[in-house]
């Protein structure tokens, strides 16, 4: 949020630009991650531009436009933490967002986890020492660090692979999907996407 109480950032900027190119007015709705797909399916909003990883499981119930950027799983600790390797996560409390792919990954590793509704809570719990590490998509956390909000360290995870983040829409809307994809493709071709990425992320993340 900015000083005018407006929702700002990379995702809002991308969504707003796509809507503008489609001749639509943007209404940004903030919701918790654990209910974000349900809200889409209940028609509370028409698209989710919220760093949602494209997975086969999600693709069974929703459609995706994009990907509009690529990220990967990343593990963060407070700067100066004794936790510096993935192996050490087994000995501490790990924070994840409820319903994200990283929650299942952490459970599969057998970690002692706490689940939260979204990144703001994750970062706050890490800052307050209630978890030793958090697992999240790399880009959103890097954005928070770039804004100077948090002093964090990255734990090297050699098994992490790139993940495409897509714009989620309800199934059965081929015209909407095509129009959004065209707007996104045009943004990437004419330099608008890169300008937005440079402003909010500091580089090209396609």
Describe the residue ranges of each PLM region:
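Extracytoplasmic small-molecule ligand-binding "clamshell" domains
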Residues: 1-51
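A ligand-binding cleft/hinge motif common to bilobed small-molecule-binding domains
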Residues: 35, 52-60, 123, 132-161
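Periplasmic-binding protein-like
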Residues: 69-77, 138, 142-185, 203-206
């Amino acid at each position: 949020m900015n000083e005018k109480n407006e929702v700002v950032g990379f995702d809002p900027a991308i969504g707003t630009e796509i809507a503008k190119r489609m001749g639509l007015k943007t209404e940004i709705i903030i919701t918790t991650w654990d209910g974000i797909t349900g809200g889409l399916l209940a028609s509370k909003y028409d698209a989710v531009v919220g760093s949602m990883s494209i997975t086969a499981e999600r693709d069974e119930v929703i459609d995706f436009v994009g990907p509009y950027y690529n990220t990967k799983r990343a593990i963060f600790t407070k700067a100066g933490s004794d936790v510096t390797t993935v192996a050490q996560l087994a000995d501490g409390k790990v924070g994840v967002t409820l319903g994200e792919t990283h929650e299942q990954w952490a459970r599969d590793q057998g970690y002692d986890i706490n689940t939260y509704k979204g990144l703001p809570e994750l970062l706050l719990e890490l800052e307050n020492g209630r978890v030793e590490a958090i697992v999240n998509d790399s880009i959103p956390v890097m954005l928070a660090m770039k804004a100077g909000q948090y002093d964090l360290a990255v734990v090297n995870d050699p098994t992490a692979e790139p993940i495409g983040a897509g714009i989620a829409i309800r199934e059965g809307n081929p015209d909407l999907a095509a129009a959004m994809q065209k707007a996104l493709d045009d943004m990437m071709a004419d330099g608008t996407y890169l300008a937005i990425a440079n402003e909010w992320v500091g580089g090209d993340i396609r």
